Regions:
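Active-site and donor-binding regions of nucleotide-sugar-utilizing enzymes
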Residues: 5-120, 245
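Catalytic donor nucleotide-activated moiety binding site of glycosyltransferases and closely related
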Residues: 184-220
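Generic beta-sheet signal
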Residues: 91, 107, 121, 191, ...
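Conserved catalytic-core segment of nucleotide-activated headgroup transferases in glycan assembly
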Residues: 159-192
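Soluble, non-transmembrane catalytic domains of enzymes that act on hydrophobic metabolites at membranes
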Residues: 4-29, 170, 174-175, 192, ...
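C-terminal amphipathic helix plus adjacent low-complexity
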Residues: 264, 269-357
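A donor-sugar binding/catalytic signature common to diverse glycosyltransferases
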Residues: 4, 227-268
Length: 357
């Protein structure tokens, strides 16, 4: 079951593909006011734009894999229509009670308890095979031939939950990434995403003076994201994107996190926090039950504390460049080892669930 968020869709598809069973994709489009409907506990399709979504018709499936608040009522509705026969697997943190789900696959930013129907992973799931990465690398390599190495990828997300990637933050990200590339004598491979505001992307690109390759979402041509993942010697990732952090980490190369937060000042003093997305997120956090809390900082802190990542901060370019240089002469870490283990464990849990039923 797919929605509007690329990160959610990546996890759902990764699990479905790895299961190796036949499946159908159902694209669900929610109405703008769906939050008001979904605050209740009932099973309803009232918040769904049925005319813009994939039709939901019998025969009902043995398994539904979903992610995100907007798709929850649809998954539960399907189970109701099947007379309880359909098993439900949800990625992340559900709004409905935990007993409504046969399995919840979660990560540290959510504060879910330890229980039999909850599987805790360290990072979001993804499924990038060596063959896919190699093909993407082969396609992109000619465009990067004249850029000096090391190649530092800059993976840019955007507005998500309470985080807003403003033009000023885009400029700061560009300046810090520029300093890092200059310190190690390399170049930048920059790609943004559908969530990246034009003001942030423009400010970031304007701040770059080192050699660089820059792809803007919607600019036409093949998306180089997988090629950049395959070829980059190090990664800078905006911290609000758990999926991009997980995919970059899985490559086994140095990882730096750019903090998209607003710092210590109260949120209500900043005009951008009164936009619909950050304001509705705070509303959801206030009105939802206590278990609905989310702190992306948990994943970031875990990555940094374990030495798997470091912060991209002012004045840190020299130390980061030294770490990048040291990594380039050290034996390369096996890409995706942790991610692959967690995907395998998740698949095993889902197969047990379906077999038992």
């Amino acid at each position: 079951m797919l929605g509007r968020k690329a990160g959610d869709n990546t996890q759902v598809r990764a699990l479905a593909d790895e299961l190796g069973c036949g499946y159908e994709e159902k694209h669900i489009l929610a109405r703008p006011w769906e939050l008001l409907v979904h605050l209740g506990s009932g099973v309803t399709l009232a918040g769904i734009d049925k005319s813009a979504s994939t039709p939901l018709l019998p025969p009902w499936p043995d398994l539904v894999i979903s992610a995100g608040r907007r798709n929850e009522p649809v998954a539960r509705w399907i189970k109701q229509q099947s007379g309880g026969r359909t098993a439900l697997v949800h990625m992340g943190r559900p709004w409905a009670g935990l007993d409504e789900w046969d399995l919840v696959v979660t990560t540290p930013q959510y504060f879910l308890p330890r229980r039999d129907n909850i599987l805790h992973n360290s990072l979001p799931l993804h499924r990038l095979s060596r063959e896919q990465l190699q093909a993407a690398a082969d396609a992109l390599s000619p465009e990067l031939a004249d850029l000096p190495r090391p190649w530092v990828a800059v993976l840019v997300g955007g507005d998500s939950g309470r985080f807003v990637l403003t033009g000023a933050k885009g400029e700061r990200l560009g300046m810090l990434a520029n300093q890092l590339a200059a310190a190690c004598g390399g170049s930048l491979l920059v790609t943004d995403s559908p969530r990246t505001a034009a003001a942030a992307a423009n400010a970031l690109q304007a701040a770059l003076t080192v050699p660089h390759y820059c792809y803007r979402w919607g600019s036409g041509g093949a998306n180089p994201y997988r090629g950049i993942l395959a070829l980059a010697d190090a990664f800078v990732v905006t911290g609000e994107s758990m999926s991009m952090l997980g995919e970059a980490f899985a490559m086994g190369r140095p990882l730096l996190i750019f903090d998209v937060g607003d710092g210590p000042q109260p949120w209500w003093r900043l005009a951008h926090n009164f936009r619909y997305k950050p304001l509705s997120h705070r509303l959801a956090m206030w009105l939802g039950p206590e278990r609905m809390r989310r702190d992306i900082g948990n994943i970031q802190a875990e990555l940094v504390a374990s030495g798997r990542a470091r912060w991209l901060e002012p004045g840190a370019a020299g130390a980061a460049a030294q770490a990048l240089t040291a990594a380039s002469i050290a034996p390369e870490q096996p890409p995706g080892s942790l991610a692959a283990r967690e995907l395998t464990a998740t698949v095993a849990a889902v197969r047990r669930l379906v077999t038992v039923r």
